[in-house]
């Protein structure tokens, strides 16, 4: 499997197994791309129970005082696992949208993508310990909607910093050391 085939499996896959499969050794993409770069995609492929929730309003996460309850903790982990899966899908999308980006940039995205896959698997394991299955609660596609229209690698990096990373800082207050 080459890098593009791996990215396609993640973006278009309809199972978590496809999206979270470790690629093993990837071959280099051929010099000539077999298809034009992906220009736009409304939503990534997803299992039915993880398709983005439609409609207005935000998804509720458990309040801080409820996190001593395993089910509530699992619900918060579910919310965060969706962030990690979205990050995985968006990294794969970058590889498909910008096949001519500098090799070092693409390599960095590929490494980060694999880290995001592992983070998703870790959240899923911990959620299961809390009695929650991934797909049990509705999920948001807001980050996909915000970042998918990117027009360049720099656009991606900028938008990622202003959305994902900033949003994750917002959840830092839930962590008590």
Whereabouts are the PLM-identified features?
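Alpha-helical phosphate/pyrophosphate-handling elements in metalloenzyme active cores
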Residues: 172
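Terminal targeting/low-complexity segments that flank the catalytic cores of oxidoreductases
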Residues: 1-82, 97-101
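Long, hydrophobic, well-ordered secondary-structure blocks that form the structural core
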Residues: 81-145
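Acidic/His metal-coordination segments adjacent to aromatic residues that form catalytic metal sites
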Residues: 57-77, 99-104, 138-164
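Amphipathic alpha-helix face/heptad-repeat signature
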Residues: 80-83, 112, 160-164, 168
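Conserved small/polar residues in nucleotide/adenosyl-binding loops
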Residues: 175-177
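Charged/polar, solvent-exposed surface patches and flexible loops
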Residues: 5-12, 18, 93, 111, ...
